[in-house]
């Protein structure tokens, strides 16, 4: 699963996920992409599950790019622990997603195969997504 190799600080504040994606909003590497139209978080497990779904469907064909990286630690306190006594330990990592962000890209497969692979991947993700293709001549 994806997670940072090293971090300067183990824990991070919650923050707010606002605005729309300006970087990473166009298909840059492949021919087809899976674009999120919702705002939210993708965990490393969700990204990996979607990647496996795409890989299994396209079999040996095509090249896949993961355009997001889960670099934000989410901390939780253990069950039945009283409030206070500091912040909990980091449990997992998430990628903050703004509307318009491309999550996956693929090249080397027909459009119908890419659509079906991304449909299977979208079922693993908690956000609404749409299929996009590269603009010809751009």
UniProtKB/Swiss-Prot annotation:
GO MF term (any one): rRNA binding
GO biological process: one example: translation
Record note on quaternary structure: Part of the 50S ribosomal subunit.
InterPro entries in alphabetical order: Ribosomal_uL16, Ribosomal_uL16_bact-type, Ribosomal_uL16_CS, Ribosomal_uL16_dom, Ribosomal_uL16_sf
Gene name tied to this protein: rplP
Family: Belongs to the universal ribosomal protein uL16 family.
Gene3D superfamilies cross-referenced by the UniProt entry: Ribosomal protein L10e/L16 (3.90.1170.10)
Basic residues composition-biased segments: 1-13
Assigned keywords, A-Z: Ribonucleoprotein, Ribosomal protein, RNA-binding, rRNA-binding, tRNA-binding
SUPFAM superfamilies for the chain: Ribosomal protein L16p/L10e
Gene Ontology cellular-component terms listed: cytosolic large ribosomal subunit
Lineage top rank: taxon: Bacteria
Organism whose genome encodes this protein: Verminephrobacter eiseniae (strain EF01-2)
UniProt cross-references to PANTHER family, sorted A to Z: 50S/60S RIBOSOMAL PROTEIN L16 (PTHR12220), LARGE RIBOSOMAL SUBUNIT PROTEIN UL16M (PTHR12220:SF13)
Stretch list, region Disordered: 1-20
Name the record gives this protein: Large ribosomal subunit protein uL16
Task performed by this protein: Binds 23S rRNA and is also seen to make contacts with the A and possibly P site tRNAs.
Pfam families hit by this protein: Ribosomal_L16
């Amino acid at each position: 699963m994806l997670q940072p190799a090293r971090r300067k600080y183990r824990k991070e504040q919650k923050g707010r996920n606002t605005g729309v994606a300006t970087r990473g909003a166009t298909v840059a590497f492949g021919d087809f992409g899976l674009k999120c139209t919702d705002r939210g978080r993708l965990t490393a497990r969700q990204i990996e599950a979607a990647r496996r779904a795409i890989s299994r469907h396209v079999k040996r064909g095509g090249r896949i790019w993961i355009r997001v990286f889960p670099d934000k630690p989410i901390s939780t306190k253990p069950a039945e622990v009283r409030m206070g006594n500091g912040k909990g330990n980091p449990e997992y990592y998430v990628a903050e997603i703004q509307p318009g962000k491309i999550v996956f890209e693929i090249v080397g497969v027909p459009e119908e195969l890419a659509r079906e692979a991304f449909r299977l991947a979208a079922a693993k993700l908690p956000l609404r997504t749409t299929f996009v293709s590269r603009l010809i001549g751009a």
